[in-house]
Amino acid sequence: MADRILTTHAGSLPRPLALTGLYARSAQGGEVNEAELSAAGRDALFHIIKQQAENGVDIANNGEQQREAFFLYLRHRLSGLGGRWTRPPRAELISHPDFAEMMKEQASLRPVVSNMEPPKAIGAISHVKPEACEQECADFDEALRIEGYEFDHTFLTAPSPGIVCAAMKNEFYDSEEAYLADLAKALRVEYEII
């Protein structure tokens, strides 16, 4: 039995402002130098490993530094996603319009990647870039090795088929069940690599 409670977090940690700016520009369809984005993501990864170690995190991860957002990165790895749609506002934003306005004001002060207008399913879903997940894992392993920090455990995140199905509207499949089944097959690639 452990003599203390191990500390961890949900996975996504704040990204540097410059990196967020690159992700925001890319998410809005702007031109982004891929080499610059990749280098900024790797730099942020190394920094976030150090931050977790220095702040006593026992179970660490890559902070999702090399992804623009928790599930939006899948548009670069899965076929069949495209276009945009506007997700309905969350219940707390409907119940508290003053809070919604404050969130909107804060978002206008800095670059942000919004998950409120994600892509939708417009074709058959399959995983087409396993090498991107493999590279993310390799970068994390390299950062841990080079930085030399020892954590009790480490992990990487991947979204569930359910959150992707709920967030990325189906405009292709005959049923949500069929959409969910193909998402599960595609995301299994990520799970097995991780």
Annotate the PLM regions:
Residues M1-I193:
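Domain-level signal for soluble alpha/beta catalytic cores
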